[in-house]
């Protein structure tokens, strides 16, 4: 289930890094998660088998679990309501019928721990997205509280850029920015407390929000998956290290060490790295949902 292998009777209206969207009508669309993998904003040639199915199951778990915090993109329809049976059978585990929403023009990132681009910013300025942090934090330090650190939404192929909350207010308006920040932190806080009981630390995550036709803020796209988040194992976590994560980190680390310049095309990823990645995605699903 890679770029070109799927043909549906619905019209494809968008192809993203991982997900493809198909038009159902003016209120609904079909979102299909492929097995494509992107790293450093480049889509790799090598798919990760079953990744789309695992991601969809993790997302659906969280959408349901967090539905009391805010509305989400579910319509209540099944793929069998909108596709012929033979097509629905093919994609039932990797597709969702969702509301057509107007996406909000920022990436809504919440961080509970210090790593990644946040760590780089902190080392240079002592801040992330303009937020002052305590001194002497190290890689993987737990932050005193979860922080909202938005970034700009760039086109596929360009890197998103961390922005301050004031810039976020300029982009989407102060009322909406306040709502997004409050909901993003509430979602992260509840999810991270639950995940901890299952042996997973959610280091940071990216939420996607949209507005419905009434202007209601709605959670959309994917939620708290190993693609949109960094998951660490409680067992291997140690501040001052770069804890291994339940996601494409195997691939990212391999690419980092390959000498690749992070421009397309990416080098071919070895089979054992791909298998380790599949196993990690599956482990995250099993831990969270069992």
From Swiss-Prot:
Belongs to the SAICAR synthetase family. Its EC number is 6.3.2.6. NCBIfam families: PRK13961.1, purC. PROSITE patterns: SAICAR_SYNTHETASE_1, SAICAR_SYNTHETASE_2. The gene is purC. This is Phosphoribosylaminoimidazole-succinocarboxamide synthase. PANTHER family: PHOSPHORIBOSYLAMINOIMIDAZOLE-SUCCINOCARBOXAMIDE SYNTHASE. GO terms for biological process: 'de novo' IMP biosynthetic process. GO terms for cellular component: cytoplasm. It catalyses: 5-amino-1-(5-phospho-D-ribosyl)imidazole-4-carboxylate + L-aspartate + ATP = (2S)-2-[5-amino-1-(5-phospho-beta-D-ribosyl)imidazole-4-carboxamido]succinate + ADP + phosphate + 2 H(+). Pfam families: SAICAR_synt. Disulfide bonds: none annotated. Keywords: ATP-binding, Ligase, Nucleotide-binding, Purine biosynthesis. The keyword Ligase applies. One of its GO terms (molecular function) is phosphoribosylaminoimidazolesuccinocarboxamide synthase activity. Pathway: Purine metabolism; IMP biosynthesis via de novo pathway; 5-amino-1-(5-phospho-D-ribosyl)imidazole-4-carboxamide from 5-amino-1-(5-phospho-D-ribosyl)imidazole-4-carboxylate: step 1/2.
């Amino acid at each position: 289930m890679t770029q070109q292998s799927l043909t549906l009777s619905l019209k494809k209206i968008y192809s993203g890094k991982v997900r493809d969207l198909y038009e159902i009508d003016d209120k609904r669309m079909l979102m299909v998660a492929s097995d494509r993998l992107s790293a450093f904003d480049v889509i790799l040639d090598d798919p990760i088998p079953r990744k789309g199915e695992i991601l969809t199951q993790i997302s659906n778990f969280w959408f349901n679990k967090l539905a009391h915090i805010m509305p989400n993109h579910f319509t209540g329809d099944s793929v069998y309501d909108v596709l012929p049976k033979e097509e629905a059978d093919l994609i039932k585990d990797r597709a969702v019928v969702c509301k057509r929403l107007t996406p909000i023009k920022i990436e809504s990132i919440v961080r509970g721990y210090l790593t990644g681009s946040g760590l780089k910013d902190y080392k240079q300025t002592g801040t992330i997205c303009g937020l002052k942090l305590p001194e002497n934090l190290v890689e993987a330090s737990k932050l005193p509280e979860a922080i909202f650190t938005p970034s700009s939404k760039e086109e596929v192929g360009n890197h998103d850029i961390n922005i301050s909350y004031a810039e976020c207010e300029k982009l989407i308006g102060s009322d909406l920015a306040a709502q997004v920040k409050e909901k993003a932190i509430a979602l992260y806080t509840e999810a991270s407390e639950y995940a901890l009981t299952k042996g997973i630390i959610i280091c940071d995550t990216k939420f996607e929000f949209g507005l419905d036709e009434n202007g209601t803020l709605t959670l959309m796209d994917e939620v708290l998956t190993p693609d949109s988040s960094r998951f660490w194992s409680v067992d291997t976590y140690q501040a001052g290290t770069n804890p291994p994560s339940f996601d494409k980190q195997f691939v990212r680390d391999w690419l980092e060490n390959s000498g690749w310049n992070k421009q397309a095309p990416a080098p071919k990823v070895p089979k054992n790295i791909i298998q380790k990645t599949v196993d990690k995605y599956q482990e995250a699903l099993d831990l969270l949902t069992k």
